[in-house]
Amino acid sequence: MSKSVYIVLVNYNGMKYLDDFMDSMHKQTYTNYKIVFVDSASTDGSAEYFKNTWTEAKTIIKKENVGFARGCNIGIEYAKRKKADYVLLLNIDTVLDNNLIEELVKYSEGERVVSPKIYSTRDKVDIWYGGGDLNYETGCHAQYHDERLEKENFDLCHEITFVSGCCMLIPIEVIKRVGGLDEKYFMYYDDDDMSLRFRKEGVEMRYIYSSSLWHKVGGSYAGKKNILTEYYFTRNRLYLMKKHKDIMRTSYHKIAKEIFEQKVYKAGANDKQYIPYVLRGICDFYIGKMGKSSCKF
């Protein structure tokens, strides 16, 4: 019998993405999966719509916005109780190729964590994620695109140091060793943190070129520069640097200074609106104010 995959979806007002997503799930060649739908107090009717439409899924509706990290952990705990073999963390603003789950499971043997090729356009012209690596100098990650793939002539499956939280398949035994997502991030940089923890535990991470999906980049704020992303990117990057200072090559104090110089002191006319939120991110990091921000975004 094929191994069981529990797909964890964290939803916040994702109504406009559900039909496309659900249609692609129905077409999967791999059928031994269960969806765990965790809703963070949506107000657009998406939780009720999903629950009534996909009755075989497990729907968990929270009364507050618990964030991506906490939402994933709720789904992960459910999967563990059900003795899942794998957990697939997946963004709801995606459309999957028919063989996505099948290919990921195939290449995850040996307790690997794997991520697929991710397109940013429906016509599959632009690759948004073609594998990635963490930069231990800056605390940021690089996602490889078409030009890197062609130049390096990558195989179907190659090792990476950053797996994308948009879609990552994790063997349940790895989760038991490494743990779930760090909820102090709330959103953003939680996948960077997981990637570093995988590395510290000796878990191999791989990019699977033969497995792909379309990510409607921006559906979960990804790809959008706004006051919300500027705050969380600033605060969480510094937290990541401090938490993993044992393997980082730059002091988080130095990174904080560089962020201030680049985004506050040298901010252009179009970026001055972000200055209060960058400063708030720096301040909240230093006073240890993590989790969901009290900022009114």
Q: At which residue positions do the language-model features occur?
A:
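Short, acidic, metal-binding catalytic loop of nucleotide-sugar glycosyltransferases
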Residues: 23-32
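A short, conserved alpha-helix in the catalytic core of glycosyltransferases
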Residues: 161-170, 174-180, 184-212
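Short, flexible, basic/aromatic active-site loop/helix in glycosyltransferases
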Residues: 135-161
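Conserved donor NDP-sugar-binding/catalytic core segment of glycosyltransferases
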Residues: 94-128, 133-135
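Short beta-strand/loop segment that forms part of the nucleotide-sugar
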Residues: 33-41, 60-62
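Short beta-strand-to-loop acidic/aromatic patch adjacent to the donor-nucleotide binding site
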Residues: 84-95
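Glycine-rich, basic loop-to-helix element that forms the pyrophosphate-binding segment
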Residues: 62-82
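Non-catalytic, C-terminal membrane-associated alpha-helical segments of glycosyltransferases
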Residues: 228-236, 246-297
